[in-house]
């Protein structure tokens, strides 16, 4: 199989208790040029233990694409404005198609 040229980007996910909060977070991070783009999906059903009790809640998942250069500032902004006491924040490096990855890693449009 032929390999596709790629560029490395970061992808991060977090969750919110309302679609409005999820959309607001993406809007804020994109407008500040900290994330290049984001998607909201949900509701999703989350199962977890909180304060010793099993919980099941509906949440909205936000997936963000951003550059290594913006990681620290994006995380600072997200943490400062996220409504949860403990935010889910999972980040991984991904290989993206060259044109898309270059766009994600570029400066403000």
Q: What are these model-derived regions, one by one?
A:
Residues 1-109:
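Positively charged, small/polar-rich N-terminal and surface patches that mediate targeting and assembly
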